[in-house]
Amino acid sequence: MALNLQDKQAIVAEVSEVAKGALSAVVADSRGVTVDKMTELRKAGREAGVYMRVVRNTLMRCVVEGTPFECLKDTFVGPTLIVFSH
C-alpha cells in the first residue's frame, strides 16, 4: 500500500514521540514469522506495555535520527519490527 506524504509524516511523528520517551529499543527481522506467531507476539507486547510496530525502513531512519537510538540506523534492512519499552 502506497503511503502519501501526510501518512508518512504522521507515522514518523507518532513513532518519534514514542522513541523520545523510550528506555530501550529492539529491532527484529520478521522474515519467516507466521501471522499467528506475530499476532501472539503483538498481544504479549501489548500486555507487557511495550510499543511494537512494523515501519518502513526509510521512515525508521528518520525516526531515530538525533536520538540515542541513532546507532540502529544501519539495522533497518528488510521487514523490520521495532519495539520500544518505557
UniProtKB/Swiss-Prot annotation:
The keyword Cell membrane does not apply. Pfam families: Ribosomal_L10. InterPro entries: Ribosomal_uL10, Ribosomal_uL10-like_sf, Ribosomal_uL10_bac_type, Ribosomal_uL10_CS_bac. Keywords: Ribonucleoprotein, Ribosomal protein, RNA-binding, rRNA-binding. GO terms for molecular function: rRNA binding; structural constituent of ribosome. Transmembrane segments: none annotated. It comes from the Bacteria. The keyword RNA-binding applies. SUPFAM superfamilies: Ribosomal protein L10-like (SSF160369). GO terms for cellular component: large ribosomal subunit. GO terms for biological process: translation. Belongs to the universal ribosomal protein uL10 family. Part of the ribosomal stalk of the 50S ribosomal subunit. The N-terminus interacts with L11 and the large rRNA to form the base of the stalk. The C-terminus forms an elongated spine to which L12 dimers bind in a sequential fashion forming a multimeric L10(L12)X complex. Forms part of the ribosomal stalk, playing a central role in the interaction of the ribosome with GTP-bound translation factors. This is Large ribosomal subunit protein uL10. It comes from Serratia marcescens.
